[in-house]
Amino acid sequence: MTSSSPTGGGPGRPSALAPEIADRLKRSADGLLPAIAQQYDTGEVLMLGWMDDEALHRTLTTGRCTYWSRSRGEYWVKGDTSGHFQWVKSVALDCDADTVLVKVDQVGAACHTGTRTCFDTDVLLADQ
Amino acid sequence: MTSSSPTGGGPGRPSALAPEIADRLKRSADGLLPAIAQQYDTGEVLMLGWMDDEALHRTLTTGRCTYWSRSRGEYWVKGDTSGHFQWVKSVALDCDADTVLVKVDQVGAACHTGTRTCFDTDVLLADQ
């Protein structure tokens, strides 16, 4: 692990995220924030990923939603492998700066299983 | 801390959650899953809370969204203090069973700051 950069990197990874954002993030013990991806026009909740400071920085500046893969330990531009990009429309933090909401335009399926969202299959309680 | 119950309690807390659900949950190190609350008809993402097995069980069986408060270390029925209940309409797990999506009918403001959602104020990137 490298040390955090002076420009606001999360624990272990340097980042170019603006300090005025980085300074108020409330990260988990592993330096991450949950990031909800929502289809900007239909309102569908597509998936939840994780971002460190640099993933948030890249999401804000590249126009493509970028996560930190906890399983692979690397940055992950959604769509780089599948072509199912998430084009960023807007980004907001929640009231205590520990969660990210990214509104996106999802190309194709958000879920690696091929369904539109990651929440389509495992329904525990149906419409009440 | 008490030990987990044989019926599927998360680390440290007993739970009556059905074993067929509990057995496939992929919890964080502290035994929790992020839970996204979404307004069922408008699609607004209202907030993100955290659930352990028992909070999920209560959400599924009481009709009111129930979280585990990480800061207070106790169960938290949304609305018990504020009156801003979240009436549960549907509950789903994501494709790898580590995130919950609860569609609710939100009474009043979801956010403790008084805004409708927790994502209304801190916009990092506006509509592109």
From Swiss-Prot, chains A, B:
Cited Gene3D superfamilies: Phosphoribosyl-AMP cyclohydrolase
The keyword Cytoplasm is assigned to this record: yes
What InterPro entries does the record tag this protein with?
PRA-CH (IPR026660), PRib_AMP_CycHydrolase_dom (IPR002496), PRib_AMP_CycHydrolase_sf (IPR038019)
Q: Its domain of life?
A: Bacteria
Recorded metabolic or biological pathway in which this protein acts:
Amino-acid biosynthesis; L-histidine biosynthesis; L-histidine from 5-phospho-alpha-D-ribose 1-diphosphate: step 3/9
Any matching Pfam family: PRA-CH
* SUPFAM superfamilies to which the protein is assigned, alphabetical: HisI-like (SSF141734)
- GO MF term set: magnesium ion binding; phosphoribosyl-AMP cyclohydrolase activity; zinc ion binding
User: Function of this protein?
Assistant: Catalyzes the hydrolysis of the adenine ring of phosphoribosyl-AMP.
Q: Which family does it belong to?
A: Belongs to the PRA-CH family.
- What's the name of the protein? Phosphoribosyl-AMP cyclohydrolase
- The gene that this protein is the product of is hisI
